[in-house]
Amino acid sequence: METEQPEETFPNTETNGEFGKRPAEDMEEEQAFKRSRNTDEMVELRILLQSKNAGAVIGKGGKNIKALRTDYNASVSVPDSSGPERILSISADIETIGEILKKIIPTLEEGLQLPSPTATSQLPLESDAVECLNYQHYKGSDFDCELRLLIHQSLAGGIIGVKGAKIKELRENTQTTIKLFQECCPHSTDRVVLIGGKPDRVVECIKIILDLISESPIKGRAQPYDPNFYDETYDYGGFTMMFDDRRGRPVGFPMRGRGGFDRMPPGRGGRPMPPSRRDYDDMSPRRGPPPPPPGRGGRGGSRARNLPLPPPPPPRGGDLMAYDRRGRPGDRYDGMVGFSADETWDSAIDTWSPSEWQMAYEPQGGSGYDYSYAGGRGSYGDLGGPIITTQVTIPKDLAGSIIGKGGQRIKQIRHESGASIKIDEPLEGSEDRIITITGTQDQIQNAQYLLQNSVKQYSGKFF
């Protein structure tokens, strides 16, 4: 990148007039990624925010948002919503939008980080799990941030380019990480573009994207995302609802919170997995033959510790977050299909041989944990460890004890474990359903623990 790019990237025609009217040929010489930016053209930018950040943008009594409207002669709004997300809408020319974003970014908070920027040597404790990183802790603009841009689904191809050439070039020229989520936001035609990096770079990247999509007409129907239709079962790259137990209120956390900006090979079937910030590729888990049902992580893991099995569940109260974990290990699965009234999953799997354990955790003949990543920091979850995938099966008659009425139980398990959990429909002629779990090793073991407890507690109570 050229040393003068920051000046070209963020011109201020009011205070630095010498940069306000630069010849087009100079801009092309200075920046390899050419843009046909028309500063007089009004465009609309929509950014997906955590609801808790709306107050910082609006300010007390609307002071901040009024100042942005007045100072930049722009339309700026953050409509209210009942969920963990809101949309920041800015209508102005592209250069002005960039200046407004530079004002807004330092006021935002990022979800679920260590309580101190320097506390990177250990995992957060349970009491720290709801702490957030406020960008205001940093001086200047030398810190990493990320924004979620909303675009119409028909515009995605213009950003990706042929075989990903455009998005690759955009990453290289702006020195940002970019992920275009595959699934649309709930009940809409919008897709999320997650852009991360230094604030100046992120803003420059957004300006280039706005320039790209402003030249492309929208194809098909347009249904902008309404955050009131928030639905966490959609893996679209938004924010997930979690609860701050100390304050008794819902807060939003990034759905991406478990992965990085990398790519995962396409899978077969299923919805893209939310825990990873992959590329624009399909992020569905790899599917393999149904393994036999696993037992509780404690005895099972110790029995076959030389195989790629999840470790025992952490001690109660020692997890990243504290939850009511009813149905303690050892409780019986009353009425479970395939087991007698006096038999548990644990007692059944204690008779498994090492080869049976290996078969249970090795779909497609490889490790049950899917280490699909491509360099960089991308494949590692924000709380430590790579993003991995494993599969288990349950008798289809027990699926209701996990899913719950309206899917509430499985949603809660996703919230508590931090893992992505997908339950496939049973194959024709099969009595089992495959559960695919994706996340860090800790998230997977917590998810398995909660799934088993749910079966124990609700077996025989179908909804």
From Swiss-Prot:
<feature type="region of interest" description="2 X 22 AA approximate repeats">
    <location>
        <begin position="54"/>
        <end position="421"/>
    </location>
</feature>
<feature type="modified residue" description="Phosphoserine">
    <location>
        <position position="214"/>
    </location>
</feature>
<dbReference type="GO" id="GO:0003723">
    <property type="term" value="F:RNA binding"/>
</dbReference>
<feature type="domain" description="KH 2">
    <location>
        <begin position="144"/>
        <end position="209"/>
    </location>
</feature>
<dbReference type="GO" id="GO:0060816">
    <property type="term" value="P:random inactivation of X chromosome"/>
</dbReference>
<feature type="region of interest" description="Interaction with ZIK1">
    <location>
        <begin position="209"/>
        <end position="337"/>
    </location>
</feature>
<keyword id="KW-0597">Phosphoprotein</keyword>
<keyword id="KW-0747">Spliceosome</keyword>
<keyword id="KW-0007">Acetylation</keyword>
<feature type="cross-link" description="Glycyl lysine isopeptide (Lys-Gly) (interchain with G-Cter in SUMO2); alternate">
    <location>
        <position position="163"/>
    </location>
</feature>
<dbReference type="GO" id="GO:1902165">
    <property type="term" value="P:regulation of intrinsic apoptotic signaling pathway in response to DNA damage by p53 class mediator"/>
</dbReference>
<dbReference type="GO" id="GO:0001541">
    <property type="term" value="P:ovarian follicle development"/>
</dbReference>
<dbReference type="GO" id="GO:0098794">
    <property type="term" value="C:postsynapse"/>
</dbReference>
<dbReference type="GO" id="GO:0043066">
    <property type="term" value="P:negative regulation of apoptotic process"/>
</dbReference>
<feature type="cross-link" description="Glycyl lysine isopeptide (Lys-Gly) (interchain with G-Cter in SUMO2)">
    <location>
        <position position="60"/>
    </location>
</feature>
<dbReference type="GO" id="GO:0003697">
    <property type="term" value="F:single-stranded DNA binding"/>
</dbReference>
<feature type="cross-link" description="Glycyl lysine isopeptide (Lys-Gly) (interchain with G-Cter in SUMO2); alternate">
    <location>
        <position position="219"/>
    </location>
</feature>
<comment type="function">
    <text>One of the major pre-mRNA-binding proteins. Binds tenaciously to poly(C) sequences. Likely to play a role in the nuclear metabolism of hnRNAs, particularly for pre-mRNAs that contain cytidine-rich sequences. Can also bind poly(C) single-stranded DNA. Plays an important role in p53/TP53 response to DNA damage, acting at the level of both transcription activation and repression. When sumoylated, acts as a transcriptional coactivator of p53/TP53, playing a role in p21/CDKN1A and 14-3-3 sigma/SFN induction.</text>
</comment>
<comment type="subunit">
    <text>Identified in the spliceosome C complex. Interacts with ANKRD28 and ZIK1. Interacts with DDX1. Interacts with MDM2; this interaction leads to ubiquitination and proteasomal degradation. Interacts with p53/TP53. Interacts with BRDT. Interacts with RBM42. Interacts with IVNS1ABP. Interacts with PPIA/CYPA. Part of a transcription inhibitory ribonucleoprotein complex composed at least of the circular RNA circZNF827, ZNF827 and HNRNPL.</text>
</comment>
<feature type="modified residue" description="Phosphoserine">
    <location>
        <position position="36"/>
    </location>
</feature>
<dbReference type="GO" id="GO:1990904">
    <property type="term" value="C:ribonucleoprotein complex"/>
</dbReference>
<dbReference type="GO" id="GO:0010629">
    <property type="term" value="P:negative regulation of gene expression"/>
</dbReference>
<dbReference type="GO" id="GO:1902074">
    <property type="term" value="P:response to salt"/>
</dbReference>
<dbReference type="GO" id="GO:0003729">
    <property type="term" value="F:mRNA binding"/>
</dbReference>
<dbReference type="GO" id="GO:0072752">
    <property type="term" value="P:cellular response to rapamycin"/>
</dbReference>
<dbReference type="GO" id="GO:0006953">
    <property type="term" value="P:acute-phase response"/>
</dbReference>
<feature type="cross-link" description="Glycyl lysine isopeptide (Lys-Gly) (interchain with G-Cter in SUMO2); alternate">
    <location>
        <position position="422"/>
    </location>
</feature>
<keyword id="KW-0508">mRNA splicing</keyword>
<keyword id="KW-0539">Nucleus</keyword>
<dbReference type="InterPro" id="IPR012987">
    <property type="entry name" value="ROK_N"/>
</dbReference>
<feature type="domain" description="KH 1">
    <location>
        <begin position="42"/>
        <end position="104"/>
    </location>
</feature>
<feature type="region of interest" description="Necessary for interaction with DDX1">
    <location>
        <begin position="1"/>
        <end position="276"/>
    </location>
</feature>
<dbReference type="GO" id="GO:0001889">
    <property type="term" value="P:liver development"/>
</dbReference>
<keyword id="KW-0694">RNA-binding</keyword>
<feature type="region of interest" description="5 X 4 AA repeats of G-X-G-G">
    <location>
        <begin position="59"/>
        <end position="407"/>
    </location>
</feature>
<feature type="cross-link" description="Glycyl lysine isopeptide (Lys-Gly) (interchain with G-Cter in SUMO1); alternate">
    <location>
        <position position="163"/>
    </location>
</feature>
<feature type="cross-link" description="Glycyl lysine isopeptide (Lys-Gly) (interchain with G-Cter in SUMO2); alternate">
    <location>
        <position position="405"/>
    </location>
</feature>
<feature type="compositionally biased region" description="Basic and acidic residues">
    <location>
        <begin position="19"/>
        <end position="37"/>
    </location>
</feature>
<keyword id="KW-0687">Ribonucleoprotein</keyword>
<dbReference type="GO" id="GO:0005521">
    <property type="term" value="F:lamin binding"/>
</dbReference>
<feature type="region of interest" description="Disordered">
    <location>
        <begin position="1"/>
        <end position="37"/>
    </location>
</feature>
<dbReference type="GO" id="GO:0043197">
    <property type="term" value="C:dendritic spine"/>
</dbReference>
